Each structure stands twice: as structure tokens, then as C-alpha cells.
């Protein structure tokens, strides 16, 4: 019984960590409009990929 309880606690802990990390990633998305930011820098286009703005020259 105690092994099951420990397993459930570990599963809940890992679930909470994954939930927090996924929320952080959503909030960490590109804060600026990438296309406009990149065009202003002289690039032809820009896209937000994995929370970072990538410019295409």
C-alpha cells in the first residue's frame, strides 16, 4: 500500500512540473510580432518558432 501511495505522489509531482513548464512555454512565446520585427531589421520574413523569433534573409 505504501508503494502505491509513493507512486501516486511521484506521478502527481511530475504532472505538476509538466503543467508548470507547459504554461511557461506558452507565456514565453514571441512577445513581438516576428514578421514586422524581422522586416524592420532588413529580413524578408520572420516566424515565431518554439518561442523564439527567427528571421529569414
UniProtKB/Swiss-Prot annotation:
Residues 1-22 form the signal peptide. InterPro entries: Scorpion_toxin-like_sf, Scorpion_toxinS_K_inh. SUPFAM superfamilies: Scorpion toxin-like. It is found in: Secreted. It holds the Pfam family Toxin_2. The record marks 56 as: Aromatic residue of the functional dyad. Keywords: Disulfide bond, Ion channel impairing toxin, Neurotoxin, Potassium channel impairing toxin, Secreted, Signal, Toxin, Voltage-gated potassium channel impairing toxin. Disulfide bonds join 30-48, 34-53, 38-55. GO terms for molecular function: ion channel inhibitor activity; potassium channel regulator activity; toxin activity. Has the structural arrangement of an alpha-helix connected to a beta-sheet by disulfide bonds (CSalpha/beta). Negative results: does not inhibit large conductance calcium-activated potassium channels (BK). Recombinant toxin that reversibly inhibits the potassium current of mKv1.3/KCNA3 channel stably expressed in COS7 cells (IC(50)=150 nM). Also shows a weak inhibition on Kv1.2/KCNA2, Kv1.3/KCNA3 and TRPV1 channels. This is Potassium channel toxin alpha-KTx 26.1. The lineage of its organism: Eukaryota, Metazoa, Ecdysozoa, Arthropoda, Chelicerata.
Amino acid at each position: 500500500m505504501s508503494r502505491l501511495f509513493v507512486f501516486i505522489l511521484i506521478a502527481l509531482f511530475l504532472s505538476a512540473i509538466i503543467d508548470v513548464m507547459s504554461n511557461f512555454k506558452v507565456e514565453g512565446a514571441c512577445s513581438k510580432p516576428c514578421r514586422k520585427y524581422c522586416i524592420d531589421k532588413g529580413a524578408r520574413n520572420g516566424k515565431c518558432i518554439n518561442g523564439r523569433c527567427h528571421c529569414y534573409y
